[in-house]
């Protein structure tokens, strides 16, 4: 699908002309940092919506508390109808280390995922290679690289920004030009090419499965039968469609678990985290944290030398994910 991404610097946009030119997807800048809101985001949204274009929003990530930045973005776009994944635009280091940048992206993404939103990461090829680690490479990728027919990256991607100086009917100046797959859409599946060896996305998935299922998969970036079987096992535990594809729902379930939410009878409901806890402690897996699950958690905690309170906090999550 042909796409563009725009912000207030574009000036006025004739969205009907944009659509007639063959564009299907429009990404609109909504926010940046802790407080900045793009002055045209709502006007652009209304215009694109009226023209029948598919709409997504992006946030330009700075070096602040990532949860606060995510909250600012979420509050800004709340109530608006999205066709495409929320994009986290990360492209400057701002004096941060690889781990700091990746942690910020992860926390921003997890905040939105826990709010029920689909997310993707936008960045440049070199930034992706040099400044992001494996903790965020399971997130759908929208990659930018100019002057090439295909980005020079060994990873699956749902979007490719191939120009920042394109010409589009309906926009007076230059525009960013993109090509998107169906994976950019809300609920869209990121299909992994099993013939692509050494894919960083697949390596990240294999690492996640080894942590979650203690499977001992070889982290080789190749989706063979063992990796597919592990994905299916995880999907079954999560109550998802068992198709062996690491799509949005499967990735979202894993991301909720890795966010390590405080979970227990008297705490907010996290279905996927609860299912994982039930699976690990030997409780009936139904996604509801009831008294039976609490008793199983308490017994497991006692066996691990933890305080047996039946509440899954940071110490219990550490045992579940980091040690056992």
UniProtKB/Swiss-Prot annotation:
SUPFAM superfamilies: (Trans)glycosidases, PGBD-like. It catalyses: Hydrolysis of (1->4)-beta-linkages between N-acetylmuramic acid and N-acetyl-D-glucosamine residues in a peptidoglycan and between N-acetyl-D-glucosamine residues in chitodextrins. Sequence repeats lie at residues 212-234, 235-254, 255-277, 278-300, 301-324. GO terms for cellular component: cytoplasm; extracellular region. It is an enzyme of class 3 (hydrolase). Its main location: secreted. GO terms for molecular function: lysozyme activity. InterPro entries: Glyco_hydro_25, Glyco_hydro_25_AS, Glyco_hydro_fam25_subgr, Glycoside_hydrolase_SF, Peptidoglycan-bd-like, PGBD-like_sf, PGBDSf. This is Autolytic lysozyme. The gene is lyc.
């Amino acid at each position: 699908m042909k796409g563009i991404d725009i912000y207030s610097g574009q000036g006025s946009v004739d969205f009907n002309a944009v659509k007639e030119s063959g564009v299907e997807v429009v990404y609109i800048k909504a926010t940046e940092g802790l407080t900045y809101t793009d002055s045209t985001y709502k006007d652009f949204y209304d215009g694109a919506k009226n023209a029948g274009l598919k709409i997504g929003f992006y946030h330009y990530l700075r070096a602040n508390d990532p949860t606060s930045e995510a909250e600012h973005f979420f509050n800004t776009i709340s109530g608006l109808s999205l066709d495409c994944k929320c994009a986290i635009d990360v492209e400057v280091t701002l004096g941060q280390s690889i781990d700091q940048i990746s942690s910020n992206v992860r926390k921003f993404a997890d905040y939105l995922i826990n709010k029920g939103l689909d997310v993707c990461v936008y960045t440049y090829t070199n930034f992706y290679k040099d400044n992001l680690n494996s903790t965020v490479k399971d997130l759908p990728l929208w990659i930018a690289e100019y002057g090439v027919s295909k980005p020079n990256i060994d990873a699956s991607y749902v979007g490719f920004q191939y120009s920042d100086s394109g010409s589009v009917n309906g926009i007076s100046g230059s525009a960013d030009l993109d090509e998107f797959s169906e994976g950019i859409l809300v609920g869209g599946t990121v299909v992994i090419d099993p013939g692509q060896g050494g894919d960083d996305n697949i390596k990240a998935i294999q690492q996640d499965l080894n942590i979650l299922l203690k499977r001992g998969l070889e982290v080789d970036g190749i989706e063979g039968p063992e990796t597919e079987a592990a994905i299916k096992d995880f999907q079954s535990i999560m109550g998802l469609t068992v198709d062996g594809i690491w799509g949005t729902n499967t990735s979202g379930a894993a991301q909720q678990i890795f966010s390590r939410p405080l979970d227990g009878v008297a705490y907010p409901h996290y279905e996927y985290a609860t299912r994982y806890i039930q699976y690990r402690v030997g409780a009936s897996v139904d996604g509801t944290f009831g008294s039976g699950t609490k008793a199983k958690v308490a017994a497991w905690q006692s066996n691990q030398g933890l305080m047996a309170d039946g509440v899954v906090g940071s110490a219990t999550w550490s045992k579940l994910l980091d040690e056992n």
